[in-house]
C-alpha cells in the first residue's frame, strides 16, 4: 500500500501555525513511508474564501519547503462529482430529500433545548420519499439506525460512538452546494487518501464520515487527530499572542527550518532530541509518539532555535534568507560588505534575521543616524585629540585588515594612556551611530576604509562643534 496523506486548508484567512503543524506532520508521515502528500484547497465557503488566502497558503508552503506531490486540488472544481455521488446515494436509498423549512428546524431546536436534549434532526422527512417537485430541499444522509461506530485513532486510541447519537447530516444544501462532511469524504475516497492527519476539532466529524465511507463501499482511511496549540496563557492561539500566520514568521526573520524544527516538537517527541534537520524529522517521525496533551507556543524557544540555526547554518545559506529583509527595507546591498561576511559576525548577536537586518543597516548606508545618548556619553571634547591621531593612523594604513586596524587602536590608547574602551567606544559611535556593534576592528573592516574614514571625520566635526558650544 502506498501511503497517501493530505493537507486540506480552507482559504478563508492566513495559514495558521496550527495548520502548518498539521501540514508538517502529514508531510513527514508521507515522506517517512516513501508515500505521497496531496494539497487540497477546501474552498466551498464562497463568502469567505479568497484568492489572496489561496496564494498565502501556496506561498507559505513554498517558503517552508513542504512540497506536495499532487495538487492543489480545489473543491469548487469538483461540484459535478459531488452531485453525481449524491444522486447515487438517493437512488440507493442511502440518502433522501428533506423539505423541512428553517422555521420548523428552528422550532425543533428550541424545543429540544428546552427539554435539555441534544439538538438534532428528528428524521421528519426520512421515510417520505419526496420527489424533486421544485420545492427547495436538502439532501440528507440516511445514518444507520442502530449499532456503534468504532475506530482506532492513532493519537487518541479506540473511540466508540453510538449511532443513536448521530442524526441524518445534510450532504447537499438547497442551493446545490455540498457540505464539508460530504465533500471531504468524496475527496478522500477519490484521492485514495490512506491516512487523515488533522486537528482534534474534527474528531466529532469522524463517526459521521466513517458511516458515509461505508455507505459508499469506500475504504476507510486511518485517522490521527492532533491536539490543539495554545498560547502560553493557556488560551487558544490568536493574534494577541503575537505572530500566528506562517508568513508573519518570515517577516519576523525566522528561518523556515527553524520554524519546522520548533513545530515538530509541539506534540511529538523522539527521546530527548531537540534539534532536528528536516531529514532527521523524516527519518524519525511516527504517529505513536504524538502526545494527546495540548501544546503551548513559546516564542522564546522558537527564537532560541532560530539563533541556533543562524549560527550553525553556512553563512551563505543564512545570507540568502537575510537578503529578502534588506530588500524589503530598500537597502542597496552593493553599498556594503558581502552578506555572508556580515552573517559571520552578526549571527550570534541576533535572535532573528529581521533584527540582524535592522541593526546592520549602517554598513550599507551613506549616512547614519546617531543615538543622541551615545553621542553625549562618548563623543566628548576630551576624545577629540586621540580620535584625530587615530584618524591619521587609520588613513595611512595600506592594508585595511582587522589586525592592522586593531594595532592602530592599541597604539593610540597607549600613546594617550587611555583604557582601550575609552578609544573603542567613541570610535564605535563615530562609525555606527550607536554604542553597540561587533568588535570595533571587525566593524571597521566590514565598513571599508573610505566609509570608516569619512564617518570618523564627520564625528570629529561633531565633537568640534560641541566643544565650541561649551
Swiss-Prot record:
It comes from the Bacteria. A motif ('HIGH' region) lies at residues 9-19. GO terms for cellular component: cytosol. ATP binds at residue 239. One of its GO terms (biological process) is glutamyl-tRNA aminoacylation. Keywords: Aminoacyl-tRNA synthetase, ATP-binding, Cytoplasm, Ligase, Nucleotide-binding, Protein biosynthesis. It is found in: Cytoplasm. Pfam families: Anticodon_2 (PF19269), tRNA-synt_1c (PF00749). InterPro entries: aa-tRNA-synth_I_cd-bd, aa-tRNA-synth_I_codon-bd_sub2, aa-tRNA-synth_I_CS, aa_tRNA-synth_I_cd-bd_sf, Glu-tRNA-ligase_bac/mito, Glu/Gln-tRNA-synth, Glu/Gln-tRNA-synth_Ib_cat-dom, GluQ/Sye. Belongs to the class-I aminoacyl-tRNA synthetase family. Glutamate--tRNA ligase type 1 subfamily. HAMAP family: Glu_tRNA_synth_type1 (MF_00022). Catalyzes the attachment of glutamate to tRNA(Glu) in a two-step reaction: glutamate is first activated by ATP to form Glu-AMP and then transferred to the acceptor end of tRNA(Glu). Monomer. This is Glutamate--tRNA ligase. It comes from Legionella pneumophila (strain Lens). The lineage of its organism: Bacteria, Pseudomonadati, Pseudomonadota, Gammaproteobacteria, Legionellales. The gene is gltX.
Amino acid at each position: 500500500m502506498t501511503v497517501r496523506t493530505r493537507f486540506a486548508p480552507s482559504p478563508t484567512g492566513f495559514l495558521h501555525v496550527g495548520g502548518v503543524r498539521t501540514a508538517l506532520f502529514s508531510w513527514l508521515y508521507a515522506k517517512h513511508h516513501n508515500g505521497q502528500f496531496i494539497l487540497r484547497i477546501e474552498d466551498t465557503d464562497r463568502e469567505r474564501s479568497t484568492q489572496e488566502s489561496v496564494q498565502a497558503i501556496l506561498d507559505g508552503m513554498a517558503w517552508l519547503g513542504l512540497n506536495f506531490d499532487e495538487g492543489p486540488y480545489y473543491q469548487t472544481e469538483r461540484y459535478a462529482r459531488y452531485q453525481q455521488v449524491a444522486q447515487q446515494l438517493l437512488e440507493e436509498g442511502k440518502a433522501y430529500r428533506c423539505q423541512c423549512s428553517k422555521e420548523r428546524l428552528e422550532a425543533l431546536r428550541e424545543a429540544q433545548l428546552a427539554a435539555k436534549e441534544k439538538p438534532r434532526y428528528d428524521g421528519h422527512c426520512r421515510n417520505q420519499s419526496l420527489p424533486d417537485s421544485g420545492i427547495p430541499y436538502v439532501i440528507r444522509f440516511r445514518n444507520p439506525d442502530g449499532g456503534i461506530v468504532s475506530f482506532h485513532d492513532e493519537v487518541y486510541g479506540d473511540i466508540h460512538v453510538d449511532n443513536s447519537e448521530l442524526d441524518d447530516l445534510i450532504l447537499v444544501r438547497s442551493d446545490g452546494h455540498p457540505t464539508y462532511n460530504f465533500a471531504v469524504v468524496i475527496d478522500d475516497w477519490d484521492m485514495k487518501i490512506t491516512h487523515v492527519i488533522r486537528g482534534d476539532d474534527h474528531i466529532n466529524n469522524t463517526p459521521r464520515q466513517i458511516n458515509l465511507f461505508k455507505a459508499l463501499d469506500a475504504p476507510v482511511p486511518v485517522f490521527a487527530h492532533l491536539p490543539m496549540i495554545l498560547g502560553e496563557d493557556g488560551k487558544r492561539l490568536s493574534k494577541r499572542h503575537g505572530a500566528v500566520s506562517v508568513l508573519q514568521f518570515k517577516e519576523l526573520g525566522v528561518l523556515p527550518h527553524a520554524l519546522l524544527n520548533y513545530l515538530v516538537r509541539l506534540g511529538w517527541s523522539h527521546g530527548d532530541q531537540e534539534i532536528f534537520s528536516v531529514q532527521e524529522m523524516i527519518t524519525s517521525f511516527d504517529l505513536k509518539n504524538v502526545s494527546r496533551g495540548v501544546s503551548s507556543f513559546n516564542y522564546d524557544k522558537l527564537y532560541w532555535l532560530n539563533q541556533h540555526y543562524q549560527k550553525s547554518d553556512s553563512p551563505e545559506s543564512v545570507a540568502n534568507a537575510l537578503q529578502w529583509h534588506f530588500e524589503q527595507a530598500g537597502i542597496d546591498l552593493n553599498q556594503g560588505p558581502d552578506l555572508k561576511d556580515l552573517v559571520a559576525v552578526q549571527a550570534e548577536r541576533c535572535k532573528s534575521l529581521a533584527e540582524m537586518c535592522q541593526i546592520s543597516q549602517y554598513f550599507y548606508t551613506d549616512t547614519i543616524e546617531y543615538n543622541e545618548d551615545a553621542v553625549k556619553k562618548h563623543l566628548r571634547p576630551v576624545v577629540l585629540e586621540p580620535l584625530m591621531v587615530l584618524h591619521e593612523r587609520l588613513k595611512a594604513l595600506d592594508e585595511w585588515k582587522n589586525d592592522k586596524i586593531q594595532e592602530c587602536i592599541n597604539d593610540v590608547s597607549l600613546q594617550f594612556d587611555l583604557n582601550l574602551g575609552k578609544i573603542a567606544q567613541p570610535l564605535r559611535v563615530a562609525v555606527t551611530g550607536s554604542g553597540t556593534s561587533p568588535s570595533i576592528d571587525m566593524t571597521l573592516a566590514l565598513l571599508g576604509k573610505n566609509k570608516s574614514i569619512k564617518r570618523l571625520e564627520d564625528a570629529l566635526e561633531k565633537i568640534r562643534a560641541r566643544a565650541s558650544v561649551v
